[in-house]
Amino acid sequence: MIRRILRASISTRVAVLVCGLAPLFIAGHLNAQAELTVPAGLPDWAFNIPDKVQPSAVRPQGIVKARGSAKEYEAAKIAGNANPPDWFPDEHPAPPKVVAGGEGTRFACGSCHLMSGQGHPEAADIAGQPAAYLIRQMSYYKSGARKDDARMGPIAKTTSDEDVRQAAEYFASLKPSTFVKVIETATPPKTFIATAGRHRQLHPDGGTEPIGHRILEIPADPLGTEIRDPHAGFIAYVPPGSIAKGEELIKSGQCTQCHGEGLKGKGEVPRVAGLQPLFVARQLFDMRYGSSAGDAAAPMKPVVAKLSEDDIIAISSYLGSLPPR
């Protein structure tokens, strides 16, 4: 069960639809100086671009603690990219330095993907994904086949093959858990996208807004998310009927032929069950418009080109509703 929930037609080629969707090493807090923009022709809701007008917010300060953890950290230290907090070290094997960070590290994998590997919507859930697949995706970033000039492109170009291997093997060894709850609604809570962490948050004014043709993903525990607590999951609001429509598209496409029973992965083919809907949608849009390439993406391009925006929302919603293992 997700922890802390808000306290209070398509051809059989859809079987390869998400073969190139597996989580990639996408860092969410990497380059604060890079201007984030939505690629032309793509829906802005999928890219978590911070609102220009920001409501006042209270940021964590001083010593912070995560519920259920015996550890504590200085908020300012763990807010950067070099020293991700390890709130629950007994829940995973010892991480390599490229993941854990520390002295001499500029960007630690765990700062955006968390020590659990499950990340936030602006990053990716890579827990339990095949090491060979993750290594291949890093090679795509390094060659430019996958484009992310603000984040993963620069990281891939400066990360050694050995560090990539160690990080991939670490994340592949982890067991994913349910990290997102998908809720269908026509009127989700009113939200805004915060500059800090690029997370969509509940608007302090309250109220609701029409869902329209969007996926709105918010932290179930905003403070826990900001201090990178791996137990602080997310809620994804999606249009009514999305899950059933997505299930129909996935089943008619026979996607389990590639992704295995329950869409939990098979061999080097990645798990797509339980991935965050916003992340999946973003990858589908990226494939359609050319910023996601490489051998794995090539057979998907003609398939993704036929999908409507509502199809992408539905497929992403259904995958997010599935148990990850």
Where do the model's predicted regions map?
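Bacterial N-terminal signal peptides
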Residues: 13-27
